[in-house]
């Protein structure tokens, strides 16, 4: 017999589509809950890619690539106008 896991303790990928709205409403949306979620995500990323025995540059290069991409998205409006000019 399979053990029954409460809906609040299920991970997002384990939730059925019909249970999704009630699962979302059970999440903690207080500032401390949101900060805790970001902290868990940071520690998960850090332990998976940075804090390993045989480390490589992959973890740090992903952070750098995300930084470059987000800055490009932020300044796209100005870059688009520069590209459309005929004379610089």
From Swiss-Prot:
Transmembrane regions listed in the UniProt entry: 62-79
The record gives the membrane topology as: Single-pass membrane protein
Family indicated by similarity: Belongs to the ATPase F chain family.
Its cellular-component GO annotations read: mitochondrial inner membrane; mitochondrion; proton-transporting ATP synthase complex
Q: What is this protein called?
A: ATP synthase F(0) complex subunit f, mitochondrial
Q: Which Pfam families match?
A: WRW (PF10206)
Q: Can you state the subunit structure given in the record?
A: Component of the ATP synthase complex composed at least of ATP5F1A/subunit alpha, ATP5F1B/subunit beta, ATP5MC1/subunit c (homooctomer), MT-ATP6/subunit a, MT-ATP8/subunit 8, ATP5ME/subunit e, ATP5MF/subunit f, ATP5MG/subunit g, ATP5MK/subunit k, ATP5MJ/subunit j, ATP5F1C/subunit gamma, ATP5F1D/subunit delta, ATP5F1E/subunit epsilon, ATP5PF/subunit F6, ATP5PB/subunit b, ATP5PD/subunit d, ATP5PO/subunit OSCP.
Which parts of the sequence carry N6-acetyllysine?
16
Q: Which UniProt keywords apply?
A: Acetylation, ATP synthesis, CF(0), Hydrogen ion transport, Ion transport, Membrane, Mitochondrion, Mitochondrion inner membrane, Phosphoprotein, Transmembrane, Transmembrane helix, Transport
- Matching InterPro entries: F1F0-ATPsyn_F_prd
What residues bear N-acetylalanine in this entry? 2
Functionally, this protein is described as follows: Subunit f, of the mitochondrial membrane ATP synthase complex (F(1)F(0) ATP synthase or Complex V) that produces ATP from ADP in the presence of a proton gradient across the membrane which is generated by electron transport complexes of the respiratory chain. ATP synthase complex consist of a soluble F(1) head domain - the catalytic core - and a membrane F(1) domain - the membrane proton channel. These two domains are linked by a central stalk rotating inside the F(1) region and a stationary peripheral stalk.
Indicate yes or no for the key word Acetylation.
yes
For the modification Phosphoserine, which residues carry it? 3
Location in or out of the cell: Mitochondrion; Mitochondrion inner membrane
Listed under GO biological process in this entry are: proton motive force-driven mitochondrial ATP synthesis; proton transmembrane transport
């Amino acid at each position: 017999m399979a053990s029954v896991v409460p809906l609040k303790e299920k991970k997002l990928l384990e939730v059925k589509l019909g249970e999704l709205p009630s699962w979302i409403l059970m999440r903690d949306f207080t500032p401390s809950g949101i900060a805790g979620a970001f902290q868990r995500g940071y520690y998960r990323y850090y332990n998976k890619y940075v804090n390993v025995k045989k480390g490589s540059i992959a973890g740090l290069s992903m952070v750098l690539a995300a930084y470059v991409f987000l800055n490009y998205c932020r300044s796209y409006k100005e870059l688009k106008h520069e590209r459309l000019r005929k004379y610089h």
